[in-house]
Each structure stands twice: as structure tokens, then as C-alpha cells.
Regions:
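Short acidic-hydrophobic sequence patches enriched in Asp/Glu that either
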Residues: 127, 154, 219
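A surface-exposed partner-binding patch
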Residues: 1-106, 162-242
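Compact, glycine/acidic-enriched structural inserts
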Residues: 109-146
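Charged, amphipathic alpha-helical linkers/stalks
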Residues: 150-158
Length: 242
């Protein structure tokens, strides 16, 4: 359980790649008011695991990352891809580790890394508990760290190599009924990212067509379509339209 893991790592000795030593400190538990405020803005129930963890702490007072918190750090956008994102960690450079909270869900996994440069969503861990274990297991800038691998390597691989994306015609002919139904709603130029069963190294370049990439999600399924943005009319086109 996440609460047990948080209790176990309190005071853990952390050594960074420069050899500097710190001891992990936890923030105080959440107050009843904080828990009620959190519940009020969620699209579904607060999972028992998170409630128990909040009774231990709201996050890290120090530690390897810029921040880690169980009370939604907020500040993350990209609502087309994640209608109910829940930010749990930040790297200090505008990138977040988030949860894709689904209405009615009682399990808040997996954890995704949302990067803006390159503009990529990458799978990080199956659960918050595993993410926490990975964060404190070794320095995040250690090349052996799962955190470092996603932060420094996987995002660039996903940006360059988009072979895992499914083209609309192939998806429309798929034996997977959910994938096929989604594809039938899309134009032939669309490509689809399927993260319903994410594995290490999986993800997609949400900005593959630039900052105006058209992102469409298929309901609560972890299926996203990426399309080129509609072309803006040129100056003369706008002028003669008047």
C-alpha cells in the first residue's frame, strides 16, 4: 500500500550523483478540510489508497524531485488529452508526472510523464506507489534510474520514432471493436495512440504536428487521435472574404 511505503521511506538516506547526502522528510498529513476540498473537485470518489496515504503525508518536504505532492500540484493543461489530470510531481522545468483520473475510478494508476520539450506523453509507472519507490531508489539523474530513463531518453525516442502509432485505415480494419469504433469517427489522415495497456517505453508525441496539433480522445478510453491542425486562412483569403 502507498501509505505503508510512505511511512517506510520517511527519513531515508538519499545520495545524489555528486555524493551529497540528504534525508527524506515528509510533509504533514492532510487536514479534513484539505481532503474535503480535494473530493469536491474530483470527477469520482477519492480512492481508499489515496485517502490512507493522505493520512500519512501530503508529499515530500525535500527529496530528489522539484516537488512531489498528493494534493494535486495543478498547473498542467492539455485538457483535450487529459480531461481530469492530477499532477503529483514536477521537475522544475515545466514538465509534470500526472495521473489520468477517470470518472468513477477507484484506482489511480498509471503514472504518465507529460513533457513539453519534446511535446510527449510517456508511460512512467503502473502506480503512485511504484513511482515513489523509483524516485527514492536512486538519484533521478542517475542513468540507471527509471525516472531518468523516461525523462532523458524515452521522451526523445517517442518524438523521433512514431512507428507505434496506428494509422486510421489500419485501426478501422482492426479486430479490436473499441479501436475500430474510434477509427470510424476519424478522417483517414489521423493516427492513433493506444495506451490502454501501457508498457515501459510507450507513449506518444502529443505535439507531433506542432503546438496546434489536434488531439481527440475516445471517451474515457486511453486512445488518442492526433491530426494536423486545420489550416488558417491566409491574409488575402481573409481580406476578400470581407
Amino acid at each position: 500500500m502507498l501509505a505503508d511505503t510512505l511511512k517506510a521511506i520517511a527519513g531515508q538516506r538519499l545520495v545524489d550523483t555528486d555524493g551529497d547526502v540528504t534525508h527524506l522528510e515528509l510533509l504533514p498529513p492532510a487536514t479534513e478540510q484539505q481532503v474535503r476540498a480535494l473530493e469536491a473537485k474530483l470527477p469520482g470518489p477519492l480512492p481508499d489508497e489515496i485517502r490512507s496515504a493522505l493520512a500519512v503525508t501530503t508529499g515530500f518536504a525535500n527529496g530528489p524531485l522539484e516537488s512531489f505532492a498528493l494534493l494535486d500540484l495543478e498547473g498542467f493543461g492539455l485538457d483535450d488529452a487529459f480531461p481530469h489530470p492530477y499532477s503529483i510531481a514536477h521537475d522544475g522545468y515545466g514538465n509534470y508526472w500526472i495521473l489520468d483520473v477517470l470518472p468513477g475510478a477507484t484506482d489511480w494508476g498509471p503514472v504518465f510523464f507529460a513533457c513539453h520539450d519534446p511535446a510527449v506523453i510517456a508511460y512512467q509507472a503502473p502506480s503512485i506507489e511504484q513511482f515513489v519507490k523509483d524516485v527514492v531508489a536512486m538519484a533521478p539523474d542517475d542513468s540507471r534510474s527509471p525516472i531518468n530513463r523516461v525523462h532523458e531518453t524515452v521522451v526523445h525516442t517517442l518524438w523521433r520514432d512514431q512507428s507505434a502509432l496506428i494509422r486510421q485505415p489500419a485501426a478501422a480494419a482492426s479486430s479490436d471493436p473499441t479501436l475500430r469504433e474510434f477509427a470510424e469517427c476519424l478522417t483517414p489522415d489521423a493516427v492513433i495512440a493506444d495506451l490502454r495497456d501501457p508498457r515501459p517505453g510507450s507513449g506518444f508525441a502529443w505535439g507531433m504536428y506542432g503546438p496546434r496539433t489536434d488531439i481527440q480522445r475516445f471517451g474515457t478510453h486511453r486512445l488518442w487521435a492526433l491530426l494536423r491542425p486545420a489550416a488558417k486562412p491566409g491574409f488575402f483569403s481573409r481580406m476578400f472574404r470581407k
